[in-house]
Amino acid sequence: DRQVYVGLPDIKGREEILKVHARKKPLAEDVSLSDIAKATAGFTGADLENLLNEAALLAARGGQRFISMADLHEAMMKVIAGPEKKSRVVPPHAKRLTAYHEAGHAVVIHELETQDPVHQITIIPRGGAGGMTISLPQEDRSYMSRRELEEHIAVCLGGRVAEQLVLGDISTGASSDIQKASSIARNMVTKYGMSEKLGTIAYTSESNEVFIGRTMAQARSYSEEVAGLIDEEVKSIVDTAYRRCEDILSQRRSQLELTAQYLLAHEVMSGETFQKVFTDPDDEVFEGLIPAES
């Protein structure tokens, strides 16, 4: 049978899809579907429909006649990360660890030019995560450069480095971050030809799956020596990113502390407030917060 591939909608397509699904929904004057379209790169048509339906439910539950921009932003977070789990009781030590972990991600993002700006930081559990740092793409991307990938690995490791730097210990909370960092590094080496030692060669097919009738030994098409070099290169990429995180967070320790203290006090931090950590740390929003380097 003939198969037709339908790609993800671009920014114009997303805005048109949003308009279609918003036709019979009352929108407040502050709503900008154009802004929502910009913030939803990677969303499918179904995701966008779900976003508007969730926003309508939020407005109804709040007794509002119109869907506000705040409703749409919360609905977007729900689509991305799942619903908030405010009923979950988080012990103080776990809350503190999560605050520094997420602050670590955010500060590293801020310091790396290729990364998308922070949209929101939260230590309220969502889905299976204890906290989350959301950065939204400013444009649609069809590819990523080596520098972008290297810096994205650093972002993944920012939480783990912050734990070690501030708390003097590490936790299992960074498990998914480490898996993601390792996966990106391995793809750089084996799929994207971004290793100087191994050259512009792909060591994996489009799918790494082992099919029926094909053994694990047959699935690998390179020698033990090359496998060892791949592991060395992956480790080198991840280790370099880790050291970069250490440098960033050591130099930006006061910003790391202020971000974490704000999260402990308020649980959620907007991208605008996070920017003030760097541009206006004496702003009244931080009043009463004493970043104690401990």
Model-derived segments and their meaning:
Residues 24, 77, 86-87, 208-209, ...:
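Intrinsically disordered, low-complexity regions
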